[in-house]
Amino acid sequence: MLRVRCLRGGSRGAEAVHYIGSRLGRTLTGWVQRTFQSTQAATASSRNSCAADDKATEPLPKDCPVSSYNEWDPLEEVIVGRAENACVPPFTIEVKANTYEKYWPFYQKQGGHYFPKDHLKKAVAEIEEMCNILKTEGVTVRRPDPIDWSLKYKTPDFESTGLYSAMPRDILIVVGNEIIEAPMAWRSRFFEYRAYRSIIKDYFHRGAKWTTAPKPTMADELYNQDYPIHSVEDRHKLAAQGKFVTTEFEPCFDAADFIRAGRDIFAQRSQVTNYLGIEWMRRHLAPDYRVHIISFKDPNPMHIDATFNIIGPGIVLSNPDRPCHQIDLFKKAGWTIITPPTPIIPDDHPLWMSSKWLSMNVLMLDEKRVMVDANEVPIQKMFEKLGITTIKVNIRNANSLGGGFHCWTCDVRRRGTLQSYLD
């Protein structure tokens, strides 16, 4: 058994968060929500370059290995996840709140063990093909290190086995020349960052900024142990009140709950991202970037990119089943709101951690090229009508692990500059 000793209340990260208090209730939630409604615009600063004080690590801005401001500039380098050794997470309260009831027996039986061998083998092959196609399109591909996620670990607050390194979008976000490691909210993902450390250290040595958000203890207080699981109606009511399975005990967030459009970054409060986590990001990125909270009619939000996926300057795919409550913000800014067609993934295909709407979880290679599932003909036709070339890849078995093309990747470098698309 892998045992890890850590200081209670400690933080693995380069940024400190003020201690808010041991009892966080409605007052804090309301304050945080009001705080987030808008942030002040600011002029560009040294974030836009890769310059560092140490001459040995001071490349010219054009040489920085990390540079990405949005979801659609020409893609030059990307991290693609791995399905190898992926494990079913233990069936804890935070996992239960983020999965469909029909799969609960699967988690109860298989938690702590590898996902079905044949399924993983197919998923590995699909992602290898995806990597080959990206390389053919001129994109540099990096992969996380293989890790055995079945190893048990223990902290002073919990013990668990791991999950996978399949979804770099969940743990990493690039903002300009900085790569940020998210703290995550599932106990099974506590050590997921280890798979990416060799890549990130390489970027750091070559001049990129590297930040790790404060690591949560993931103590019992972070989770609402009485969160109603069965009632969708109750979940709708609680979501409208900003209450989820994660509490405001300490900051937590998944990077996939943020989506970028130049100076403006949009975030949702979800089952894995709390208001304190978003506040940490807002303070950390200010004044160069503005972080806005948006919300959706979604009883079980987890990750924004299969609900609200920005595919170009002022162009967004908006999930018709999960309408955005703040859509007028984008309409007033002149954005084009596109409703993607209903996905056609079969009902009997296992989706252990996600919904069928992974069909809209696409990866833009640039404004005129998109990587889309080879089986999803309706959305292919939609893109073609928009004048966007579709690069068709089959990742149906990889979908079962909880992500589409956007989830399976983290765009490290796109050829572009910092701009504002909301003013």
UniProtKB/Swiss-Prot annotation:
One of its GO terms (cellular component) is mitochondrial inner membrane. Residues 1-43 form a transit peptide. It is linked to Cerebral creatine deficiency syndrome 3: An autosomal recessive disorder characterized by developmental delay/regression, intellectual disability, severe disturbance of expressive and cognitive speech, and severe depletion of creatine/phosphocreatine in the brain. Most patients develop a myopathy characterized by muscle weakness and atrophy later in life. It is an enzyme of class 2 (transferase). It catalyses: L-arginine + glycine = guanidinoacetate + L-ornithine; 4-aminobutanoate + L-arginine = 4-guanidinobutanoate + L-ornithine; beta-alanine + L-arginine = 3-guanidinopropanoate + L-ornithine; taurine + L-arginine = taurocyamine + L-ornithine. Gene3D superfamilies: L-arginine/glycine Amidinotransferase, Chain A. Homodimer. There is an equilibrium between the monomeric and dimeric forms, shifted towards the side of the monomer. The modification Phosphoserine is found at S46, S49. This is Glycine amidinotransferase, mitochondrial. GO terms for biological process: creatine biosynthetic process; creatine metabolic process; learning or memory; muscle atrophy; positive regulation of cold-induced thermogenesis. Changing R282H: In CCDS3; uncertain significance; decreases glycine amidinotransferase activity. Arginine binds at D170, D305, R322, S354, S355. One chain folds into a compact single domain composed of repeating units, five beta-beta-alpha-beta modules, which surround the central active site. Belongs to the amidinotransferase family. Changing S231C: Decreases glycine amidinotransferase activity. Keywords: Acetylation, Cytoplasm, Disease variant, Membrane, Mitochondrion, Mitochondrion inner membrane, Phosphoprotein, Transferase, Transit peptide. Its EC number is 2.1.4.1. Changing Y203S: In CCDS3; loss of glycine amidinotransferase activity. Pathway: Amine and polyamine biosynthesis; creatine biosynthesis; creatine from L-arginine and glycine: step 1/2. Changing A208T: In CCDS3; uncertain significance; loss of glycine amidinotransferase activity.
